[in-house]
A protein has these predicted regions:
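Basic, Lys/Arg-enriched alpha-helical interface segments
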Residues: 2-60, 97
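Enriched for short, Lys/Arg-rich terminal
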Residues: 66-70, 74-100
Length: 100
């Protein structure tokens, strides 16, 4: 079982997104955060289960999609490092992940 580690920027982005959603619908924001954490925790057992981001076909990064979020991570059998969270409709910039 891999250890799931959230980076500070990933947590900040998720928090900012949840705060924005909560302005109109606090219950939806809470539900989204819970869904994201549930989906990411599954990576502890299956670290390679996320898809390879279409924008980064030859990279070590993977992503999990929990609408409206894309959650980017790197992982192996020992550790899953959650790196970045963004809204699905935003364009991914490679520098957001620290380069490839």
């Amino acid at each position: 079982m891999a250890e799931v580690i959230w980076t500070e920027p990933a947590l900040q982005e998720l928090d900012a997104l949840a705060e924005y959603i909560a302005l109109d619908n606090p219950a939806a924001a809470s539900h989204l955060v819970q869904d994201v954490f549930d989906k990411i925790e599954r990576l502890a057992d299956f670290p390679q289960s996320g898809r390879i981001p279409p924008e980064l076909p030859n990279s070590v990064y993977r992503e999990v999609v929990v609408p409206p979020c894309r959650i980017f991570y790197r992982g192996d059998e020992k550790r899953v490092l959650v790196l970045y969270v963004m809204r699905e409709e935003r364009q991914l910039r490679v520098y957001m992940l620290g380069g490839c």
